Structure formats: structure tokens, C-alpha cells
Amino acid sequence: MKKQNNLRSLAAQAVEQVVEQGQSLSNVLPPLQQKVADKDKALLQELCFGVLRTLSQLEWLINKLMSRPMTGKQRTVHYLIMVGFYQLLYTRVPPHAALAETVEGAVSIKRPQLKGLINGVLRQFQRQQETLLNEFATSDARFLHPGWLVKRLQNAYPTQWQRIIEANNQRPPMWLRVNRTHHTRDGWLGLLEDAGMKGYPHPDYPDAVRLETPAPVHALPGFAEGWVTVQDASAQGCAVFLAPQNGEHILDLCAAPGGKTTHILEVAPEADVVAVDIDEQRLSRVYDNLKRLGMKATVKQGDGRYPAQWCGEQQFDRILLDAPCSATGVIRRHPDIKWLRRDRDIAELAQLQAEILDAVWPRLKPGGTLVYATCSVLPEENRDQIKTFLQRTPDAALSETGTPDQPGQQNLPGGEEGDGFFYAKLIKK
């Protein structure tokens, strides 16, 4: 297959599909990666992630340097210019190469007549860069987040919102989960050191290791054999709070892509686990993860609001509900989230979460444990959600995580720590 090698035009098309069409980067990027040589895949990914991370700034610069926006069939050029700005600001690509390749990208998207315009805007930016960046530093766009999300974070975290925003704008660390059925964490860290890499254990999550420097999975000792899995430290907290035991009947609801399903089975290899997700396509990832780790679980497609459709009258000893959410705790890992979410989505998600909680609670045995988890930092989906659930559910009691007035444990994203995550552990009386 002929490889299309103008990365800049491909990156522009990817960002356009995210911002204009509401597609997630995880769906858009893989087919575009197939169009470039292996050596260029990392740069294409960097351009896509980087432009989405700094989109507010790049948009602000375009508005300063162009008298009117590019619209209609020329819209891709708008994003191509952003790709040019991003290279000049944030990459080690030599400026002359960044300019030449970005201008040439106009040919790939069949807009050769706009090469002069692109060249002119990028050169004007180079001339005015210092003045423009000084002005940008005092603008509302400097937070690199949509205004509605900044307001929500300010309201929820009056003293911490800037730290959360700064964390969201950083590159994420790479966390791994050591498969305790194969090695102790210390034992695997020794293998990692033998392979010339360094890792650090997490103080609270017993299987979690942070790599000093992110590495491709094929370089990790025993990855193909299932000795280790890529999973953020905070996501590993779910199994810690769930505390699964061998012989128990356990439901992992909203299970795709299967990271938590397999963690449950590493902690309790003889548990009977049912993994359910509404998205048939994403369930293929659950099967892949189970296969790589040599594990078995019952995998079903189903809507969490209607458990009778996928589990009949079954009841479970433990339930993990990793609820659908705004994903505002994992923005540093998925910067497209900032531009895919809308303010109105939060109330809709909170309503969906409440419906799933109410539907699945009767499926928990008396004395059983339900862990409600999200990768959100917004109280409407987390603390407020559990507070109102406890008020309307007399046989539910909070355990280990917070108080009835301030229920749950909220992890915030930050530095080398895990992602933003919320957990509430509930016991059925």
C-alpha cells in the first residue's frame, strides 16, 4: 500500500474530525496511522495529541493573525495552520522543515492555491511570536480548556482548580499493573531493571508500577505472556476497594476494554466474573485482554439499566460499576475530551448513572459490596450522585470511602500520580 507521507495534512484532518464532527481521536487516529511509514507514526500521534492539548492557544493565534476564518471546503486548512503553529511552538522539528512540510500539506488536501496563505500566516507568527505569546498569557484562552469546564472546576475546587487544569495540560505518566499470579511487584521490577528500565511502586495500589520513561509495550518484560498490563494507577484502585474473593460471583458492569475485569481475576483467579458492556465493538477488547492473560470470564453485551435482559434474576456477591461519565479526570491522557464534551452532557450523564445504580442495586446480595467508580472530577457525577443514592436507598451503607455528607474518595490528576478518579464503596445491609 502506498504510504501518504504528509503527516501535517493527516494531523489536520484528524483534528478536524474530532472538533468539527465530534469523533474521538482513538477512533480517528488508527486508520490514519496506516497511511504513514512506521518511523513517522510517533510524530503523527504527537501532532494530533499536541494540537488537541493546546487547541485554545492555536485558535487564539489564528484569530489574531487572520482577518476571517477558513470555512467550508477550506476548513481543513484552518487546522493545517494550527499544526504549523504547534510544531513551531512545541516540537524539535526545525522551523524551516515545519514550514515547508506544513505548506506542502496544502497539496495533499487539494488546496495548492492556499500554499502562499499558509506560508504567510506562519511567517507572520514567527515575526510576532514574542509579542503574541505575551498577550496570550493574560487571555482567557491560556487555560487551554473550554470556558464551561473552567467554570465547573472553579466552582467545585475553589483552591485547587488551577492545579487540576495544569495537570490536565501535562503529558501523562505510564502506569503498569503487575500480574500477581505470575510475579510479585518487586520481582517484576527486578526484571524491568535487567531490561535497562526503571520503575517505581505506588504506595497505595499494590500492583501498580510507574515507568521512569514511557516505553513501547513490546519492550516490557513478559508483556505478551501477560505478566504486566498497561493501566493507570487510579484505575487499579477499583479492585482494591472491591476486594474480590475466590469463589464469588462478581459483576463488572461497563467493563470494556477489560482492564478491570482482568485485574479482578488476577486478585481472585477462582472468582466467577461476568463482564458486561453496552458497546459490542469495545467488547472485542475485553476478549483480547482475557486471551493475552490466559483468563476466562463470561462476557455479555447489555445495557446497565436493564439487567434482566443480560443476567435474568442472578444476584452477585460483588459489583463493580465503572459508570459512563464525562472522563474529565483523564484529559491529560485523552485531550480530545475537552472538545467532545458539552456543558449539557453532565446532567445527562448524571441521570444515566443514577438509572444504572438503581437498576443494578437489587442484583447485589445482602451483605454484598458495590463499588461505584468514575474517571470524572465533577461532583455531580461523584459525591452528589452517591449522596442522593444513599438518601433514596435505605439498605445501602457507605464503607471506607468518605462520610455520608462527603461520600467517596476523589483522586485528582497530578504530576506523576494517577489520573482523576472517584470511588464509593457501598455495602448492602
From Swiss-Prot:
Localization: Cytoplasm
InterPro entries documented for this protein: MeTrfase_RsmB-F_NOP2_cat, MeTrfase_RsmB-F_NOP2_dom, NusB-like_sf, NusB_RsmB_TIM44, RCMT, rRNA_ssu_MeTfrase_B, rRNA_ssu_MeTfrase_B_ent, RsmB-like_ferredoxin
Chain ranges passing through the membrane: none
Catalytic activity line of the entry: cytidine(967) in 16S rRNA + S-adenosyl-L-methionine = 5-methylcytidine(967) in 16S rRNA + S-adenosyl-L-homocysteine + H(+)
GO terms for cellular component: cytosol
Gene Ontology annotations of biological process type: regulation of DNA-templated transcription; rRNA base methylation
PROSITE patterns: NOL1_NOP2_SUN, SAM_MT_RSMB_NOP
Root EC class: transferase
Active-site feature positions: 375
Predominant subcellular localization, coarse grouping: cytoplasm
Keyword line: Cytoplasm, Methyltransferase, RNA-binding, rRNA processing, S-adenosyl-L-methionine, Transferase
Keyword RNA-binding in annotation: yes
GO molecular function terms attached to this record: RNA binding; rRNA (cytosine-C5-)-methyltransferase activity
EC number: 2.1.1.176
Compositional bias per record (Polar residues), positions renumbered to this chain: 400-412
Binding site for S-adenosyl-L-methionine: 254-260, 277, 303, 322
Stated role: Specifically methylates the cytosine at position 967 (m5C967) of 16S rRNA.
Family as reported in the entry's similarity comment: Belongs to the class I-like SAM-binding methyltransferase superfamily. RsmB/NOP family.
Protein's name according to its UniProt entry: Ribosomal RNA small subunit methyltransferase B
Species the sequence originates in: Salmonella paratyphi B (strain ATCC BAA-1250 / SPB7)
